[in-house]
Amino acid sequence: LIFTIDRIMCQGSWLDYGMFVQNVMVAARARGLHTCPQVAFLQFHRIITEHVGAPPNEMLVCGMSMGHADTSAPINALVTERAPVSEFARFIE
């Protein structure tokens, strides 16, 4: 999947767009599919936007792979460490 956004959209729209992309990922999982959002596609933005026929006012946000994960592939066994919530959030009671 290739995601683009109109260049005139302001910062708040980028937040909305991120939530939209996340919901695509959640919907995919609900249907048994795996996803991998990929911002690395941005380095090829000129080639990609031209290839998909995006108008000049659209800019590339990200790409996303979607399908069935190969659970036997060693790369799919990678589990990264997560910071505890207390490192980035403070709860006020």
Language-model-detected regions and their locations in the chain:
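Short proline/glycine-enriched turn/loop segments at secondary-structure junctions
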Residues: 49-56, 76-78
